[in-house]
Amino acid sequence: MDDFKKFELISDYKPAGDQQKAIDEMVNNINQGIQRQVLLGATGTGKTFSVANVIAKTQLKTLVLAHNKTLAAQLFAELKEMFPHNKVEYFVSYFDYYQPEAYKPITDTYIEKDSVTNAEIEMMRLSTINSLATRNDVIVVASVACIYASVSPIEFTKKNLYLHVGELIEFEQIKYKLVQLGYERKDYDLVPGTFRIRGDLIEIMSGYSDKFKIRISMFGNEVESIDLCDPITNNIISKEQRFILRSASEYIFDDSRLAIAIENIKNELDERVKFFLKNNQLIEAQRIEQRTKQDLESIVEFGFCSGVENYYRHLEHREPFQTPWTIFDFFSYNNQDWLLIVDESHISLPQVKGMHNTDRSRKQTLVEYGFRLPSALDNRPLNYDEFNKKLSKTIYVSATPNDEEIALSDNHIVSQIVRPTGLLDPIIEIRKTEHQIDDLINELMLLKNKNQRAFITVMTIRMAEDLTNYLNNTKIKAAYLHNELKTLERSVIINKLRKGIYDCVVGINLLREGLDVPEVAGVFIFDADKPGFFRSDKSLIQIIGRAARNADGKVIMYADVITQAMQTAINETKRRREIQLAFNLKHNIIPKTIIKPIHEDLSGHDYKQNAELYAAKASKNEYNQKIKELKKKMEEAAKKREYEVAAQYRDMIVELEAIKQSVKSK
């Protein structure tokens, strides 16, 4: 390790409710050598804060696994705020859009791979790997896509340029090494992964950060100084005595290894063509020969080709069926101890289980019909057994853990039931389905009169649409939350619910992240007695938890019979509520509804509407002040790497500037 720092948790809050007990128990389990445990934390008990305390107390490098990019981004923002002096990294798929290569034999349809990569996320991935290779105080927040193949830590750590002040090294040698590391020479604007030469100065923008550039000053063949500079102002950020520069991208293949890989690909191609000819599959033989030879020509000339990942087994010199390298190997490199946090484990683990089989099924068809060599099957995610073998100390975090996590942890379950706010799990009522709509409207009117909101969950899209339309023809203002909405569009609807523009939101899947709304005092579950995933005991407990942010929280289930799933959910909620009540009585705590700020809507056309609304009300003197405020917010969002939010602030500024100009011209 080049840099040793301790994890330092910075927060205005101290553990409260059940948090301290849970933190102590988890830390004690880790210190006693217990490899796996479950944090069974009720909704709203501050599980992320407890996990952050465990990281600070154990001082272990940590990987936090989330089941999607949105949740990963939320966790990344929270942990970055709590650990401002440590490295908190974001490691998700760098594709903004991805259509995998596929073949459908029934219709003889070949679907070519199509993708759009995100350069910013690609840089963040490389930053993650670099941090893991050089520091000990690293927290990585990743999506489940991190089980896909990555670069070998052995190869990555080999590829570097190490320089120190006073070192004797030829100018040409530095240039040669930079090119070997994948850096491209540019004479003008530097972007990540490029360098330029100006007299005795070499300026490099690393592949893993755009926050600084490295300026190397040479005096003949001697390194005179190494400065980290601001890429825009050129001001010196820090003077370094030594610096290690890592490669410009995840995968860099040197010429000698490339030559061996190409020879091995040719040998595999010969064997595959013989196989197809032997089985009288002439079309497949011609197809695999033509496609592979085209790829090889491109690799020889440019060092890559479209779909180069299908040749990674050869390019990395791995054996057939060998477990691929992943981000996990950077944590365990040099036999280091580390910590894995599986967030929402009841969703994340099933995803991990399914990814390998889905990937293999698609590629197997490509191999059988001559679109890919069999070695393409080795460019894959970890299977579930490999995933479990990679793990070190693990905490499965969930309000409703599956039997899988409980078995893996050998029943080492840490409970976190009491909320720091003293809020209780909601009261549950069961009502018959007869006249359920009339009953719902009566309940919604009661909530509306108290300035409270509601979530309504139904089983079908048709029911959701019909119910929303019906409610909107009454005195109730309703919105329909469906899965085709983008993340930011969903947050606009939730914000409008919080502001009282809507009285309720109707949806099918109310288990997703971002639905913790303190104004919601009523949750209504239609068809509670119907079988299916959305009415399982665990799903019901998650839905019930949506009413646990409000002191008046209540859940009404519409059902004609009480199913086993319903009874289990009711019993568990009752058990938790009794524990919470007892704690509150003992400590004289009065439950209070959470006060949570409502952020500005910055999605879709809302920024334009907000700008025009502001312009209609603003005086000329206020324009500049408002734009100044928005620019500050944009810069703050960019610093937190909330780039989507920053972009929306930028659009709002542009809109205000345009309106300001049009007002001036009138």
From Swiss-Prot:
<dbReference type="GO" id="GO:0009432">
    <property type="term" value="P:SOS response"/>
</dbReference>
<dbReference type="InterPro" id="IPR024759">
    <property type="entry name" value="UvrB_YAD/RRR_dom"/>
</dbReference>
<keyword id="KW-0227">DNA damage</keyword>
<feature type="binding site">
    <location>
        <begin position="41"/>
        <end position="48"/>
    </location>
    <ligand>
        <name>ATP</name>
    </ligand>
</feature>
<dbReference type="InterPro" id="IPR036876">
    <property type="entry name" value="UVR_dom_sf"/>
</dbReference>
<keyword id="KW-0228">DNA excision</keyword>
<dbReference type="GO" id="GO:0006289">
    <property type="term" value="P:nucleotide-excision repair"/>
</dbReference>
<dbReference type="GO" id="GO:0005524">
    <property type="term" value="F:ATP binding"/>
</dbReference>
<keyword id="KW-0742">SOS response</keyword>
<protein>
    <recommendedName>
        <fullName>UvrABC system protein B</fullName>
    </recommendedName>
</protein>
<dbReference type="InterPro" id="IPR041471">
    <property type="entry name" value="UvrB_inter"/>
</dbReference>
<keyword id="KW-0347">Helicase</keyword>
<dbReference type="InterPro" id="IPR006935">
    <property type="entry name" value="Helicase/UvrB_N"/>
</dbReference>
<dbReference type="GO" id="GO:0016887">
    <property type="term" value="F:ATP hydrolysis activity"/>
</dbReference>
<dbReference type="Pfam" id="PF17757">
    <property type="entry name" value="UvrB_inter"/>
</dbReference>
<dbReference type="GO" id="GO:0005737">
    <property type="term" value="C:cytoplasm"/>
</dbReference>
<keyword id="KW-0963">Cytoplasm</keyword>
<keyword id="KW-0378">Hydrolase</keyword>
<feature type="domain" description="Helicase C-terminal">
    <location>
        <begin position="436"/>
        <end position="598"/>
    </location>
</feature>
<dbReference type="GO" id="GO:0009380">
    <property type="term" value="C:excinuclease repair complex"/>
</dbReference>
<keyword id="KW-0067">ATP-binding</keyword>
<dbReference type="InterPro" id="IPR004807">
    <property type="entry name" value="UvrB"/>
</dbReference>
<dbReference type="Pfam" id="PF02151">
    <property type="entry name" value="UVR"/>
</dbReference>
<dbReference type="GO" id="GO:0003677">
    <property type="term" value="F:DNA binding"/>
</dbReference>
<feature type="domain" description="UVR">
    <location>
        <begin position="624"/>
        <end position="659"/>
    </location>
</feature>
<feature type="domain" description="Helicase ATP-binding">
    <location>
        <begin position="28"/>
        <end position="171"/>
    </location>
</feature>
<comment type="similarity">
    <text>Belongs to the UvrB family.</text>
</comment>
<keyword id="KW-0234">DNA repair</keyword>
<dbReference type="InterPro" id="IPR014001">
    <property type="entry name" value="Helicase_ATP-bd"/>
</dbReference>
<dbReference type="InterPro" id="IPR001943">
    <property type="entry name" value="UVR_dom"/>
</dbReference>
<dbReference type="InterPro" id="IPR027417">
    <property type="entry name" value="P-loop_NTPase"/>
</dbReference>
<keyword id="KW-0267">Excision nuclease</keyword>
<keyword id="KW-0547">Nucleotide-binding</keyword>
<dbReference type="InterPro" id="IPR001650">
    <property type="entry name" value="Helicase_C-like"/>
</dbReference>
<comment type="function">
    <text>The UvrABC repair system catalyzes the recognition and processing of DNA lesions. A damage recognition complex composed of 2 UvrA and 2 UvrB subunits scans DNA for abnormalities. Upon binding of the UvrA(2)B(2) complex to a putative damaged site, the DNA wraps around one UvrB monomer. DNA wrap is dependent on ATP binding by UvrB and probably causes local melting of the DNA helix, facilitating insertion of UvrB beta-hairpin between the DNA strands. Then UvrB probes one DNA strand for the presence of a lesion.</text>
</comment>
<comment type="subunit">
    <text>Forms a heterotetramer with UvrA during the search for lesions. Interacts with UvrC in an incision complex.</text>
</comment>
<dbReference type="GO" id="GO:0009381">
    <property type="term" value="F:excinuclease ABC activity"/>
</dbReference>
<feature type="short sequence motif" description="Beta-hairpin">
    <location>
        <begin position="94"/>
        <end position="117"/>
    </location>
</feature>
<dbReference type="Pfam" id="PF12344">
    <property type="entry name" value="UvrB"/>
</dbReference>
<dbReference type="GO" id="GO:0004386">
    <property type="term" value="F:helicase activity"/>
</dbReference>
<dbReference type="Pfam" id="PF04851">
    <property type="entry name" value="ResIII"/>
</dbReference>
<dbReference type="Pfam" id="PF00271">
    <property type="entry name" value="Helicase_C"/>
</dbReference>
